[in-house]
UniProtKB/Swiss-Prot annotation:
Name of the featured protein: Odorant-binding protein 2
Family, per entry: Belongs to the calycin superfamily. Lipocalin family.
Alphabetical UniProt keywords: Olfaction, Sensory transduction, Transport
GO terms under biological process: sensory perception of smell
Known function: Binds the chemical odorant, 2-isobutyl-3-methoxypyrazine.
Quaternary assembly: Monomer.
Length: 18
């Protein structure tokens, strides 16, 4: 798993959850 992809996924989830 690409760390960058994971980071982006978490960021998207955080933004959507915000």
């Amino acid at each position: 798993v690409d760390p960058a992809q994971v980071s982006g996924s978490w960021r998207t989830a955080a933004i959507a959850s915000d």
